[in-house]
Amino acid sequence: MPRVWDSRLDALGVRVVTPAGAQVHLVEARWLDASQAGDKFHIFVRVQDANGQPQRDQEFRVRFTTETAETRIERTKGPGLDDFFGNFAMFPGLSYAVDIPSATSEQVTGLVRGAPGNPAANSSFFLVFQRGAPVEPPRPDDGPPTLDETTRRRLVALLDQAQAEIDAARALLEGNP
């Protein structure tokens, strides 16, 4: 199964650490920026069984450092408003890591509140872990495709033609026909 990964997480420094023999895998990770998060500044976690069914009352571990290393155990919730997501509030200036303590689990690291340049902004993460078969990490962006020479020449000719039309229109607008 391919992992659903919000590509903005890469720029934020969010990473997935996969230990040998992992039994629980991250299958989805999304980030909500300030415009999407509203008044929320939380890490939301859902744990699914091997068939993809969300499970209530599953523990998830949140690690962060203040003056000392801190670990908190939270639980997922049930159906309804929470839709099986448990949550943990984030505070500015701290970096968080999340995993599932009941089994060998992938760990998501580098979760921080806010956005680059504004650590106090509201933002949230949605993480979905699933027991069972490993997932395929997302393929890195390979960039634009390589063009064959004929296609490249056609595109350059089209761009030249478009530029000539733009130049002619500009001359008309400026009164220099």
Task: Identify the residue ranges that each predicted region occupies.
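Beta-strand-rich domain onsets/edges
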Residues: 1-42, 48-54
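Exposed beta-strand and adjacent loop surfaces of beta-rich binding modules
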Residues: 40-42, 57-61, 95
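Structured interaction patches on ligand/partner-binding surfaces of diverse proteins
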Residues: 103-131
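Mid-length scaffold segments of soluble, non-membrane domains
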Residues: 46-69
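Short, low-complexity, charged amphipathic interaction modules
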Residues: 143-177
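Short, acidic Ser/Thr/Gly-rich low-complexity loop/linker segments typical of extracellular
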Residues: 58, 66-92, 106-113
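Short, low-complexity, Pro/Ser/Thr/Gly-rich segments in the mature regions of secreted, periplasmic
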Residues: 123-136, 165-176
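A short, solvent-exposed beta-strand micro-motif common in secreted/extracellular proteins
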Residues: 94-104
